[in-house]
Every structure is written in structure tokens, then in C-alpha cells.
A protein has these predicted regions:
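Nucleotide/pyrophosphate-binding catalytic subdomain
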Residues: 1-127
């Protein structure tokens, strides 16, 4: 069975979206692309699939929120941008998913969530 056939038969599909998919070269969110992505995910969910969206983009959305043009090199500054951008990104996802009758939720994971059995089990149950 090739990859396309496995995908057609999959009960659960994980979609990983990178920053360049969500943000235009200008640094502004690409609302049209986000809407198409969410519509496809909602259609698959309505067809009975379990859907998980893994999304990057919080730093870029945070940069746009405060008008910053260049990504800082310092980790604390990136963390601050991610904190700003994450809530904005989730607000966008919640709005787009609501347009298609779906509820968006957020689960924040770290490497430790996969490495430690009890954390892995809790994360899996949350999903």
C-alpha cells in the first residue's frame, strides 16, 4: 500500500503547518490560506476522520502584532514573541474553525511529553 492509499484509509490524520504556510512574505497572516486549510480539515473531520493540526507560526504572528520586521536572535525575545503570537494564532484558528462548525483546542507539548511515559499517556489522552 502506497502513502496515498494509507492516507485514504487513515482514521487519524496529523497535519503539520509551517510558518511559511500561515504568513505572507510581508509578515502578515495569510487569512485566505488559513481559511482553506481549516476548511479542508473540517471537511475531513465531518467525513469521520480524527484530525490533529500541529502549527508553527506563533513567533511570526507575534512579530506582526508588535510591528517587528526582523526575528531577534535572543531566545528570551523569541519566547516573548511566541507568547504574544500564540494567543493571536489560537484566536485566528478558533474563528476559522467556528466558521465551519468546529471547536479548536490547544495542547502545548514538549520533548519531555514524549520521553516520559506518564506524560506521554496524559498527552495522548488529551488528544
Amino acid at each position: 500500500m502506497n502513502a496515498r492509499e494509507r492516507l485514504r484509509e487513515a482514521k487519524r490524520i496529523v497535519v503539520k503547518v509551517g510558518t511559511s504556510t500561515l504568513v505572507r512574505t510581508s509578515g502578515k497572516p495569510d487569512f485566505r490560506r488559513m481559511d482553506r486549510l481549516v476548511r479542508e480539515i473540517a471537511d475531513l473531520k465531518n467525513a469521520g476522520r480524527e484530525m490533529v493540526l500541529v502549527s508553527s507560526g506563533a513567533i511570526a504572528i507575534g512579530m506582526d502584532s508588535i510591528g517587528l520586521q526582523e526575528k531577534p536572535a535572543e531566545i528570551p525575545a523569541r519566547q516573548a514573541l511566541a507568547a504574544i503570537g500564540q494567543s493571536s494564532l489560537m484566536t485566528l484558528y478558533k474563528k476559522f474553525f467556528a466558521d465551519y462548525g468546529q471547536t479548536a483546542a490547544q495542547v502545548l507539548l514538549t520533548k519531555e511529553n514524549a520521553a516520559r511515559h506518564h506524560q506521554y499517556a496524559n498527552s495522548r489522552n488529551a488528544l
